[in-house]
Amino acid sequence: MPSNLRDKPLIACLHPYVEERRKDIEQGLYPRHHLWGIEDIEKEKNWRTKTISSTSVQVPTLLERLLDRSIFRGSPGTKVELAALRASRISDLVYSVCGPLALAKTYSNKLVSWTFRNPIDLGSSFKLSHRAYRPRNLSANAAFFCLTSKSESSYANFAPSRFIPWCVDMDLFDGLPSAGKPQKPFFLATGKTGRDYCSLVKGSSLVNAEVRIIGPSHQKPDRIPPNVKWIDTSKDPPDQAIDYPTLREWYAQCTAVCIPLSGDSDDTCGYTNMLEAMAMRKPVLMTHSGCLDIDPETRGFGKLIEPQDHSGWTDAMNYILKDKKRADRLGEEGRRMTEKEFTIERFNRDVLKFLRELLENRKELVD
């Protein structure tokens, strides 16, 4: 290898969830924002990159299950952890889209992790499990990327942290009208994590419109009113039930997007769903979140509903149905915001800027 290449720092990228998705992303069948900046990290000329793959890691099945339920509980799992540890031996930084890793203390201060919520309160009952979030382990990270300003303040107690707002694939979610019109108006709700579909379903019974819910069966209420259509996404990946081109069409056809959340004030659940709806020019009806830095009502692209308030869902949906022009204005404001604040290009620039700063600081320490 030429010496000028050997002299360049090496960033190892850990993102096992898209190992088999790169081709789909290139073909526009899967959202590009799920790359988390890796496409531009790979193009950067000031460093080299390596993709961490867990497929070559061999662990006996019983041992893997034991480790996944103990030491690696709350982390991406045994094979991913071991693959990342091996890559850290030859890398200057390990860029983890999987969140904090349980073996961070063995990385020689090279691990840079994305965080999606405030540090988990482990309490006194945890010993081996969730060790990725133990204070000593968090302090061993080189830095943190944070989706919210609230989490930036929390993780800054352990390592340098940078708040970078999320983004959305505006080529897939292009905001254009649907090729066809639905037979009747419908609201759309989708998502598997941190959802409160019981409140939404109960509130839907007094709304003169269909409500389509794309969610796992274990979150499905026992009683479903006639105007609610449930699409099961129990299997992973979720787009086995409905692919993204079809989901994009449903976004385009729906009256508004509903995001009923469980009310966890430290979780960013619903963020991606919200941005996809905004990009598609749809009003966002969403449970109040104590974590996200934007909300639909304050910024003028939707309505907020209090946690577990089924009547609030009824009122919000009827509010949208009552005035189509008002609903269109809310949707247009959401699209305007995504074009200005939540593009992939802006997100990737912010990620690369922080990585450059971290590498420069490491170089100064070595010099």
PLM regions: where:
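A short, well-ordered alpha-helix in the C-terminal region of glycosyltransferases
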Residues: Y319, R326-E341, D350-K353
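Nucleotide-sugar-dependent
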Residues: P238-P245, E249, V257-L275, M286-I294
